[in-house]
């Protein structure tokens, strides 16, 4: 490859997604990619872009940053320290976040899979950078795989 210089910089985007809190430039970059590419929110029909629009009235946002493995589900367990990792968040509409509550992912995913059907369920996974079958994964394995999928957006 003539004229092309290479650099030994580490690939750091997946590592940046390992930090706590769904905020900052890396999280905002992920959201921006979702806005531009147009996927639907997790298990929903509205797009991320639609839910991020400023509300015409009222004080409640149309979307929530949902803990995929709910915070209270992880609280007090061996992964309590990692419950707010960026890779553990997805945009959901406000009502779905209330419905999911603090349920084990195995419980709430089964409900949405039955309601959506297999094709829409798989699409929702892909559009939200979720490893297929995450609800059956060890939490740390889920975080590792999701960081890689998110960094591809």
What does each of the following model-derived ranges do?
Residues 1, 5-66, 73:
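Intrinsically disordered, low-complexity N-proximal targeting/linker segments that flank membranes
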Residues 3, 83-86, 144:
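Short, solvent-exposed loop/helix junctions and linker helices
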Residues 5, 10-11, 69, 87-90, ...:
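Short acidic (Asp/Glu) and glycine-rich catalytic loops that position anionic groups and cofactors
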Residues 6, 117-153:
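C-terminal, well-folded lobe of enzymatic/effector domains
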Residues 28, 44, 61-64, 85, ...:
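Alpha-helical structural motif
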Residues 56-88, 104:
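Histidine-centered nuclease catalytic patch
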Residues 71, 96-99, 115, 119, ...:
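Hydrophobic alpha-helical segments
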Residues 85, 89-114:
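Short Cys/His-centered divalent metal-binding micro-motifs
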């Amino acid at each position: 490859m003539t004229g092309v210089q290479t650099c030994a910089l580490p690939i750091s985007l997946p590592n940046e997604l390992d930090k706590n809190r769904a905020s900052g430039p890396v999280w905002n970059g992920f959201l921006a990619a979702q806005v531009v590419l147009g996927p639907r929110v997790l298990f929903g029909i509205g797009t991320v872009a639609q839910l991020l629009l400023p509300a015409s009235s009222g004080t409640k946002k149309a979307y929530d940053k949902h803990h995929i493995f709910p915070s209270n589900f992880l609280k007090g367990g061996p992964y309590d320290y990692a419950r707010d990792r960026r890779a553990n968040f997805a945009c959901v509409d406000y009502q779905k976040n209330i419905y999911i509550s603090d349920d084990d992912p195995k419980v709430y995913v089964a409900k949405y899979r039955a309601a959506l059907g297999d094709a829409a369920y798989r699409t929702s996974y892909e559009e939200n950078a979720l490893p297929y079958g995450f609800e059956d994964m060890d939490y740390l394995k889920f975080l590792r795989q999701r960081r890689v999928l998110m960094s591809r957006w």
